[in-house]
């Protein structure tokens, strides 16, 4: 059931020829195996509701460990979210100058699991009034495809921009520019939908042209956007403008 939602979201975010056909085939196989799209749709709705009610959590990671699904041979002992939150609050400081200079920064977790560290970083950025959707590239990598997909689902639903790489970080690490990762043999890249928005598209364009692609360029080209929403079931929707 996990695969159906993953494949659909990737097809929306990544329609490159080298990925599209294989993803369409996997999508069809998931539907055939499950018998219908209703089960994964209900599961996705549960995840969405959980993250809407409480963004400050690693919902899938906690469930994964509570069900004793972790593989100790792969070192799957997920860091508790409270620890990830503490680390993000310690490290996510003095970032204004970096964003002002380049327009964005990248945050990488080479052993992402279900994405707790990156989720905590996104929430810390939001707490500090930084629009992480437009100014942070989230890069995740994990050797385990299932946990990597859990990370992809949660970061995508939280509106993060970036990608997840399924591969061994030690023997097959990501290479290339952070905006243009090289997908090597043995790697599987999953691009988050938000990474295809107008601002990141302009940044990749300017980077490919040799420009800086920083704040001044992209924000003059792309007006402040109001359609990136954070949801809270107990409050009205809040729109966060670019900073």
Report each predicted region and the residues it spans:
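Short, small-residue-biased leader/transition segments that mark boundaries at the very start
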Residues: 3-8
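Long amphipathic alpha-helical segments that form oligomerization/scaffold cores
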Residues: 15-18
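Conserved Class I S-adenosyl-L-methionine-dependent methyltransferase catalytic core
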Residues: 21-90
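Intrinsically disordered, low-complexity regions
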Residues: 60, 70, 96, 227-230
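Conserved S-adenosyl-L-methionine
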Residues: 81-185
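S-adenosylmethionine
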Residues: 154-243
């Amino acid at each position: 059931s996990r695969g159906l939602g993953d494949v659909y979201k990737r097809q929306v975010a990544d329609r490159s020829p080298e990925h599209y056909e294989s993803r369409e085939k996997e999508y069809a196989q998931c539907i055939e195996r499950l018998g219908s799209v209703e089960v994964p749709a209900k599961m996705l709705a549960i995840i969405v509701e959980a993250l809407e009610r409480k963004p400050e959590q690693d919902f899938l990671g906690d469930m994964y460990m509570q069900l004793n699904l972790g593989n100790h041979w792969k070192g799957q002992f997920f860091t508790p979210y409270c620890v990830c939150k503490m680390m993000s609050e310690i490290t996510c400081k003095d970032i204004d100058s970096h964003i002002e200079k380049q327009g964005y920064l990248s945050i990488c977790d080479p052993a992402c699991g279900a994405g707790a560290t990156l989720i905590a970083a996104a929430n810390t950025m939001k707490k500090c009034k930084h629009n992480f959707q437009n100014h942070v590239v989230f890069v995740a990598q994990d050797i385990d495809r299932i946990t990597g997909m859990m990370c992809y689902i949660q970061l995508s639903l939280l509106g993060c921009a970036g990608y997840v790489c399924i591969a061994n970080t030690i023997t097959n690490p990501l290479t290339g520019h952070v905006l243009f990762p090289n997908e090597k043999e043995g790697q599987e890249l999953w691009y988050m939908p938000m990474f295809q928005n107008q601002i990141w598209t302009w940044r990749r364009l300017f980077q490919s042209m040799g420009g800086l692609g920083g704040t001044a360029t992209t924000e003059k080209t792309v007006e402040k956007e109001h359609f990136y929403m954070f949801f809270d079931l107990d409050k009205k929707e809040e729109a966060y403008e670019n900073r």
